[in-house]
Amino acid sequence: MAYTLPELGYAYDALEPHFDAMTMEIHHSKHHQAYVNNANAALENLPELAQGCPGQLLTKLAEVPADKLTAIRNNVGGHLNHSLFWKSLKKGTTLQGALKDAIVRDFGSVEAFQAEFEKAAATRFGSGWAWLVLQENGKLAVVSTANQDSPVMGKAIAGCEGYPLLGLDVWEHAYYLKFQNRRPDYIKEFWHVVNWDFVAERFEKKVEHCNCTK
């Protein structure tokens, strides 16, 4: 089953003035499309691995042939991460309810959570992602991953683990047209476009046995 580029569900300029339309268009139609194309190419002769969603595949990278591992890790990871990212973006939503209560419980305050998340995003050397994850013990945590690694890959591969609720892409292609080298400014703008309704849904439903974006 070939992967396909998901539709955004909103216009490229829907997140203006925080995220610009040109970056969104290039990021989605060029960068994400490349991950989809390369993932499909890597899986072309591995139909047993191509079944199901990318999140399921990334939890069992140990089953991937060694000569395909890097390509699948990078490109299926990129497809999964971006698919989650697009759904995590929307103006005008509010952090509330059970998710807000859990954030206050585990970080002390919403402000403390945001500060920790911003630090993870700003200090990720080179390319990667910052994440809010739900751990197996039921607590929330902030982690970061390099390149297109995802927490669903597990600690041995990604250096962390957890069920991703919210991710921020800190590759330069995600922000450089608008923010140039000012990554901290990009991170600050992110809070204006987080789709807290989507994040809360992931927190409350925790899609069983799947780390995709259904």
UniProtKB/Swiss-Prot annotation:
<dbReference type="GO" id="GO:0005737">
    <property type="term" value="C:cytoplasm"/>
</dbReference>
<dbReference type="InterPro" id="IPR019833">
    <property type="entry name" value="Mn/Fe_SOD_BS"/>
</dbReference>
<protein>
    <recommendedName>
        <fullName>Superoxide dismutase [Mn]</fullName>
        <ecNumber>1.15.1.1</ecNumber>
    </recommendedName>
</protein>
<feature type="binding site">
    <location>
        <position position="173"/>
    </location>
    <ligand>
        <name>Mn(2+)</name>
    </ligand>
</feature>
<feature type="binding site">
    <location>
        <position position="169"/>
    </location>
    <ligand>
        <name>Mn(2+)</name>
    </ligand>
</feature>
<dbReference type="InterPro" id="IPR001189">
    <property type="entry name" value="Mn/Fe_SOD"/>
</dbReference>
<comment type="subunit">
    <text>Homodimer.</text>
</comment>
<keyword id="KW-0560">Oxidoreductase</keyword>
<dbReference type="GO" id="GO:0046872">
    <property type="term" value="F:metal ion binding"/>
</dbReference>
<keyword id="KW-0464">Manganese</keyword>
<dbReference type="InterPro" id="IPR019831">
    <property type="entry name" value="Mn/Fe_SOD_N"/>
</dbReference>
<comment type="similarity">
    <text>Belongs to the iron/manganese superoxide dismutase family.</text>
</comment>
<dbReference type="InterPro" id="IPR019832">
    <property type="entry name" value="Mn/Fe_SOD_C"/>
</dbReference>
<dbReference type="Pfam" id="PF00081">
    <property type="entry name" value="Sod_Fe_N"/>
</dbReference>
<keyword id="KW-0479">Metal-binding</keyword>
<feature type="binding site">
    <location>
        <position position="27"/>
    </location>
    <ligand>
        <name>Mn(2+)</name>
    </ligand>
</feature>
<comment type="function">
    <text>Destroys superoxide anion radicals which are normally produced within the cells and which are toxic to biological systems.</text>
</comment>
<dbReference type="InterPro" id="IPR036314">
    <property type="entry name" value="SOD_C_sf"/>
</dbReference>
<feature type="binding site">
    <location>
        <position position="82"/>
    </location>
    <ligand>
        <name>Mn(2+)</name>
    </ligand>
</feature>
<dbReference type="Pfam" id="PF02777">
    <property type="entry name" value="Sod_Fe_C"/>
</dbReference>
<dbReference type="GO" id="GO:0004784">
    <property type="term" value="F:superoxide dismutase activity"/>
</dbReference>
<dbReference type="InterPro" id="IPR036324">
    <property type="entry name" value="Mn/Fe_SOD_N_sf"/>
</dbReference>
